[in-house]
């Protein structure tokens, strides 16, 4: 249920865009992302850092988009978020010695540190590619294609990369953990 709730702002953005325009969709995105944050606080008495970070960026870029009536800002948001995610993974690992991917998944999956480092680098590269692809699509193709790319293209790419990361990690798990997962 919690994962579904994370997709609600994206679904609302797409639906409002299809019936109205980018500015109404952006306004709806800001409002629904804020409601999502409030729901997390009310339901779980906790707001994830990533959720708050995303809300702040959506609010900032979305607010600029609506205020100036210029879709350039909301288009840049996707790239900024992806590049900041990539930088966060790299700086955390190589600046502070903490692998964020391992911190998120390491309790459930026991893989060697070099494997976690490759997965971390892979995700940093993935986020960078997504940010660059977004720039290309946002500023070289029609707005409707960008919206479809943002909603379906990036989501599909993320699901595929998540699956590939899982397969890669699984290959490097200890045999006893693999056997446990098969049960």
UniProtKB/Swiss-Prot annotation:
> Coiled-coil stretches, from where to where?
none
Q: Which Pfam families match?
A: IspA
Q: Which species?
A: Aeromonas hydrophila subsp. hydrophila (strain ATCC 7966 / DSM 30187 / BCRC 13018 / CCUG 14551 / JCM 1027 / KCTC 2358 / NCIMB 9240 / NCTC 8049)
As for subcellular location, the record says: Cell inner membrane
Name the gene for this chain. Answer: yciB
Q: Per the record's keyword annotation, is 4Fe-4S included, yes or no?
A: no
Q: Which NCBIfam families does the annotation name?
A: ispZ, PRK00259.1-2, PRK00259.1-3, PRK00259.1-4
Residues passing through the membrane, by range: 4-24, 50-70, 72-92, 119-139, 149-169
**Which protein are we looking at?**
Inner membrane-spanning protein YciB
Summarizing the function annotation, the protein's role is: Plays a role in cell envelope biogenesis, maintenance of cell envelope integrity and membrane homeostasis.
């Amino acid at each position: 249920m919690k994962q579904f709730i994370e997709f609600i702002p994206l679904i609302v953005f797409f639906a409002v865009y299809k019936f109205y325009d980018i500015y109404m969709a952006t306004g709806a995105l800001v409002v629904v992302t804020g409601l999502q944050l409030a729901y997390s606080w009310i339901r779980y008495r906790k707001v994830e850092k990533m959720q708050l970070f995303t809300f702040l960026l959506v609010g900032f870029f979305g607010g600029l988009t609506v205020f100036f009536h210029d879709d350039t800002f909301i288009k840049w948001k996707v790239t900024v978020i992806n590049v900041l995610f990539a930088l966060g993974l790299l700086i955390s690992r190589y600046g502070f010695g903490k692998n964020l991917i391992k911190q998120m998944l390491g309790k459930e999956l026991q893989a060697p540190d070099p494997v976690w480092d490759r997965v971390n680098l892979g995700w940093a590269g993935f986020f960078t590619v997504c940010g660059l692809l977004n720039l290309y699509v946002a500023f070289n193709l029609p707005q409707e294609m960008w919206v479809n790319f943002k909603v379906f293209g990036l989501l599909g790419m993320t699901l595929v990369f998540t699956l590939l990361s899982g397969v890669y990690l699984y290959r490097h798990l200890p045999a006893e953990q693999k056997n446990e997962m098969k049960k």
